[in-house]
Amino acid sequence: MSTLVNAASRDALAATELQLLQATDGAAAAEITGLADELFGVAELLRREATLRRALADASTDPRTREDLARGLLADRLGGRALPVVVEAVRSRWSSAKDLISGLERLARTALLVQAERAGRLDAVEDELFRLGRIIGGQVDLERLLSDPTTSAEGKATVVDQLISGKVEEVTQSLVRQLVTHPQGRVSDGLEELAELSAKRRERSVAHVRSATPLSEEQQQRLASTLQRIYSRPIALHLEVDPDLGGGLLVRVGDEIIDGSVAGRLQSLRRDLAD
């Protein structure tokens, strides 16, 4: 797995994760699995097609140009849940084409973890990923085989199925299969990162809310209800009044930021005008 260290790419990921959460809102498990598969598929397409990859990640072009290109090429290939996520991704500013691919893969993994979370199985997935990382890391030959980027992806996926099929959660199996298909470094390290990603999702139960004016009780209840629907768990609100926002709300849940403030919209407009 690849960690996004550039600030622009982290901001792009945060914006696209918000779109992902909206896409999964009210979705059945099979729909979320399909969404994840399609995001993995787009990442694979960009990995193969260098010209397309560069065009969709070119921050010097107008975001609308990148959006039109993505819609023209992918609208017939993607479902109604995946397409808006991909569009948001290509409209965003990534530091490199590699980060765009890594971001799409991260979003696909997050979708699968959301599925496990809503089924009440996120704890189990986290534990399985952690234990598999330790098991594979302790077997030198297996680690070498699964981490080798020159080894057949299909062959490695078959090995994974033989090892864990029927023994772990379906989400766990899907995550491991995808990880070994395109390993970036040691698979055991990738599994540890996935376990950490799972743990972060479990910890996202507090929303830090900044508003230009105090929220009424009714507004607080409505916001808490909306966030609970998005995150599939009760969300406690930590409220702060910040007149500099000008209006609207700025909500942070874990690493995810929902910026509906006037100041945020103006800043976004300035970035678009500068592109």
UniProtKB/Swiss-Prot annotation:
Membrane topology term: Peripheral membrane protein
A Pfam family: OSCP
Localization of this protein: Cell membrane
Keywords, comma-separated and alphabetical: ATP synthesis, Cell membrane, CF(1), Hydrogen ion transport, Ion transport, Membrane, Transport
GO molecular function: proton-transporting ATP synthase activity, rotational mechanism
PROSITE patterns: ATPASE_DELTA (PS00389)
Domain of life: Bacteria
Main location: membrane
GO cellular component term of the entry, any: plasma membrane
InterPro entries assigned: ATP_synth_OSCP/delta_N_sf (IPR026015), ATPase_OSCP/d_CS (IPR020781), ATPase_OSCP/dsu (IPR000711)
PANTHER family, per database record: ATP SYNTHASE DELTA CHAIN (PTHR11910)
Function: F(1)F(0) ATP synthase produces ATP from ADP in the presence of a proton or sodium gradient. F-type ATPases consist of two structural domains, F(1) containing the extramembraneous catalytic core and F(0) containing the membrane proton channel, linked together by a central stalk and a peripheral stalk. During catalysis, ATP synthesis in the catalytic domain of F(1) is coupled via a rotary mechanism of the central stalk subunits to proton translocation.
Quaternary structure note: F-type ATPases have 2 components, F(1) - the catalytic core - and F(0) - the membrane proton channel. F(1) has five subunits: alpha(3), beta(3), gamma(1), delta(1), epsilon(1). F(0) has three main subunits: a(1), b(2) and c(10-14). The alpha and beta chains form an alternating ring which encloses part of the gamma chain. F(1) is attached to F(0) by a central stalk formed by the gamma and epsilon chains, while a peripheral stalk is formed by the delta and b chains.
Family stated for the protein in its record: Belongs to the ATPase delta chain family.
Protein name: ATP synthase subunit delta
Gene name in the database record: atpH
